[in-house]
Amino acid sequence: MKYDIIGDIHGCFQEFQDLTKKLGYNWNSDLPIHPDQRKLAFVGDITDRGPHSLRMIEIVWELVINKKVAYYAPGNHCNKLYRFFLGRNVTIAHGLETTVAEYEALPSHQQNMIKEKFITLYEQSPLYHVLDEKRLIVCHAGIRQDYIGRKDKKVQTFVLYGDITGEKHADGSPVRRDWAKEYKGTSWIVYGHTPVKEPRFVNHTVNIDTGAVFGGKLTGLRYPEMEIVSVPSSLPFVPEKFRPIS
């Protein structure tokens, strides 16, 4: 099986459509379907900050749950939106407010449909995907070699948030260790979460979050070819979001 792994979309539907077309997908049925049966895999954070979060929920639900032709691993923004839809007390900030505004503008029957689709998508998707006979791991923020195969709370925190130290940057965002430098495994770990200006290859890991929602690019990784394909963002560039990893 061949995969096209897509970085953090954050509601950037136009960039997602542009990227999938560049990757050879047809949109004849309003969904990206590849003529050679390649499958899309999403590293999470499909919503928040960008203009079309609900459209992305509907597309990813259709591909993953209904047609079963794609893979999705949830990100930290996905986790927060899931908790919002469950009625938990979450702070509506850091991008969630854009998704909530879209959601609240809908009639109640459409709200219920979006809520049900996202809850189903989240609950039926694993924390990370182990593909190609364990040669490929797709997850949101990365995973340590000794965590592969585990699903406990410590692993959940790692794959959603990265290797956080407990400290904070001046803007309140968490300080993260550079776990990829310590990775010694042979499985390819393809992830996102931390915006980088260019895809970052370290050992057998690749960070493909190139900050589409911050004016960078939306990036896909063609596997097993290990070929990078990107499209430019239509949004303003926000340089402070591309912080070096500690």
Curated annotation (Swiss-Prot):
GO terms for molecular function: bis(5'-nucleosyl)-tetraphosphatase (asymmetrical) activity; GTP binding; nickel cation binding; phosphatase activity. It is an enzyme of class 3 (hydrolase). GO terms for cellular component: cytoplasm. Its EC number is 3.6.1.17. The keyword GTP-binding applies. It catalyses: P(1),P(4)-bis(5'-guanosyl) tetraphosphate + H2O = GMP + GTP + 2 H(+). InterPro entries: Ap4A_hydrolase, Bis(5'-nucleosyl)-tetraP_PrpE, Calcineurin-like_PHP_ApaH, Metallo-depent_PP-like, MPP_PrpE-like. Keywords: GTP-binding, Hydrolase, Nickel, Nucleotide-binding. It holds the Pfam family Metallophos. Its cofactor is Ni(2+). CDD domains: MPP_Prp_like. PANTHER family: BIS(5'-NUCLEOSYL)-TETRAPHOSPHATASE PRPE [ASYMMETRICAL] (PTHR42850:SF7), METALLOPHOSPHOESTERASE (PTHR42850). HAMAP family: PrpE. Belongs to the PrpE family. Asymmetrically hydrolyzes Ap4p to yield AMP and ATP. This is Bis(5'-nucleosyl)-tetraphosphatase PrpE [asymmetrical].
